Amino acid sequence: MLPHRDPATQPEGVVAGYAQTASRWPAEPLVRRPQTRTELGAPQPRRRLAPARGDLAGHGTKRAAGQLIHLRARVVDEDGAPVAGALVEVWHCNAAGKYIHPNDTNDAPADPNFYGAARLVAGDSGLVELRTIKPGAYPVPDTRVWWRPPHIHFSVWGRVWLSRLVTQMFFPGEPLNETDYILNAIRDPAARSRSLARLMPTERGPANALVYEYQLVVRGRGATPSLP
């Protein structure tokens, strides 16, 4: 069964101006099918995938380069109730705009002290916490040059395999937000604002990190926009 998808708040997977998104979206129309015991009772992802580190910034004196941030992300449903036990996967580039995976052709320098990805399990309040560095911007390898603003990728698994949200979190006040094809594929301004983290200017995180908060709404009409 396909969830409600408002085109104003949930953009299509193929984003104009970003050719790579064509390979991340079904080429054929989606098919609606009834929910069965298989869809509702499949193995829970968190039982198959163990939670990993919640620190991407390194340890001790060997810390990743860049602005240290402490991120608090809360997973909730459409009623605001916490989704305890949700499996949250996080990944982003380093401060120079370089990802750790081998397919990244950006010639920016790698950071040997930056881990690049984490896997966390939400607690009873739906909260996961992560220490990392603020990612950098990077140019998109496309027919025309444009830059991705700093952003963090999330994959949130629910209680079954077919319950998954893939999205991106952006930082407020970034000039490149205004020209980003991914963020601006969300046509509704209110929905677009739900993809922005909130800076907590009066708080100080561990090791003097900037503190950001973000809410991941996994379903419903107020769901966090799905982004590739």
Give, region by region, the residue ranges found by the protein language model.
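Beta-strand-dominated extracellular/periplasmic modules and repeats
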Residues: 1-228
